[in-house]
């Protein structure tokens, strides 16, 4: 049995809304006839997006029927991949990278900010039940360390002050601007020299 277990509190029913249903059908069309079960990961993601960032057992059963796939097979996929949340995380799910590059650049300060603003413990919902946070392994944006991910967006080049400001926005129901918080474009250098051509006048 997986160590990642579903929440004890589960809704009785789940079904795709019209937007999710349209997206699911579009994805299934990409697969050859008889291979629709290959869309299971994409459909789990759609279900998670619809259901405030987590997947209840009812959604797994629904997807199983939708794909003519045994429920246990859907359950195996959902519990194996950590990108699928098996319990409520709130409308804003904050993932703080604490792998070496981010830690060396001050990720511990981002963790402090999350503890102060959201909850003292990881994976614990904020007082308004709208937000939670957790430490994660590398999110692949090492050059913009330290950084964190909120739902689908990256927030990069952070410090504690900027992190607190971002968290204030989401706790008030807003959506902060993603990207670099030091004014960089993607992962360009921070100084005046942006390309090798700039070295001519160095």
Regions found by a protein language model. Name each.
Residues 1-202:
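Signature of N-terminal electron-transfer/Fe-S-associated modules in redox systems
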């Amino acid at each position: 049995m997986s160590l990642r277990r579903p929440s004890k509190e589960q809704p009785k029913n789940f079904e795709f809304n019209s937007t999710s249903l349209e997206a699911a059908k579009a994805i299934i069309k990409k697969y050859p006839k008889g291979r629709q079960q290959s869309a299971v990961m994409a459909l789990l993601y759609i279900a998670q997006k619809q259901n405030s960032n987590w997947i209840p057992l009812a959604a797994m059963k629904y997807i199983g029927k939708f794909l003519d796939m045994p429920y246990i097979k859907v359950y195996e996929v959902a519990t194996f991949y950590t990108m699928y949340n098996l319990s409520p995380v709130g409308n804003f799910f904050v993932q703080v990278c604490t792998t070496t590059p981010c830690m060396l650049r001050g990720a511990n300060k981002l963790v402090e900010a999350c503890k102060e603003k959201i909850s003292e413990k990881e994976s614990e919902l904020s007082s308004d039940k709208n937000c939670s946070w957790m430490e994660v392994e590398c999110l692949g944006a090492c050059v913009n360390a330290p950084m964190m991910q909120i739902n689908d967006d990256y927030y990069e080049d952070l410090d504690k002050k900027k992190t607190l400001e971002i968290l204030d926005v989401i706790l008030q129901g807003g959506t902060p601007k993603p990207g670099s918080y030091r004014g960089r474009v993607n992962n360009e250098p921070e100084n005046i020299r942006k390309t090798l051509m700039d070295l001519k006048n160095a």
